[in-house]
Swiss-Prot record:
The keyword Transcription applies. This is HTH-type transcriptional regulator SAR2658. Keywords: DNA-binding, Transcription, Transcription regulation. PANTHER family: ACREF/ENVCD OPERON REPRESSOR-RELATED, ACREF_ENVCD OPERON REPRESSOR-RELATED. It comes from Staphylococcus aureus (strain MRSA252). GO terms for molecular function: DNA binding.
């Protein structure tokens, strides 16, 4: 990418981040970002496919930091129960702190792109290794189902409409996804 194109892209991300922080992700359109920057929509869409794509790049640095700390959990804790409990606490707090951006990313037109993202893959393999069994298909299924339960949409629904506390949400997931032996380690 040319230097001026990189600078334009960085400027777009910075202004979008500022506007999202000030007015909320849901209140800012791609058109508004282009107007704020004094650029055409074509320039904006040359850098980002859609708002979901832009949100992903805006949050990328935070995702990288999250993944670094997330991986450290396996080194710091030893039982599957502790690893899962601490990782869920960390992940759920991240979801709360970045709710609007994550909603935008997960609601994007290209859902497959999110599931292929480095962030999703890191989460998948983190929990896949935790659930590892002789039945690879079952382990993949179990991991995919956990990640669906951890999607922003499902998490928000449970917290806001079912009135489940975050601690209860975490504990329910621990009960569902870890067997009794692992919970009592």
């Amino acid at each position: 990418m040319r230097k001026d194109a990189k600078e334009n892209r960085q400027r777009i991300e910075e202004i979008a981040h500022k506007l999202f922080d000030e007015e909320g992700v849901e209140n800012i359109s791609m058109n508004r970002i282009a107007k704020e920057l004094g650029i055409g929509m074509g320039t904006l869409y040359r850098h980002f496919k859609d708002k979901s794509d832009l949100c992903y790049y805006v949050i990328q640095r935070d995702l990288d930091i999250f993944i670094t700390h997330f991986k450290q959990i396996k080194d710091d804790y030893h039982s599957n129960y502790e690893v899962m409990q601490v990782s869920l606490d960390y992940l759920l707090q991240f979801k709360i702190d970045h709710k609007a951006l994550l909603q935008c990313i997960e609601a994007g037109n290209n859902k497959l792109r999110f599931y292929q993202s480095a962030f999703y893959q890191e989460l998948f393999y983190f929990y896949y290794d935790l659930f590892k069994s002789d039945d690879d298909i079952y382990t993949k299924f179990k991991t995919d189902m956990l990640l669906q339960a951890l999607s922003t949409r499902v998490f928000d629904f449970q917290i806001e409409h079912r009135n489940i506390s975050i601690e209860a949400y975490r504990n329910y997931l621990l009960n569902i996804y870890l067997d009794e032996v692992e919970r009592n380690d």
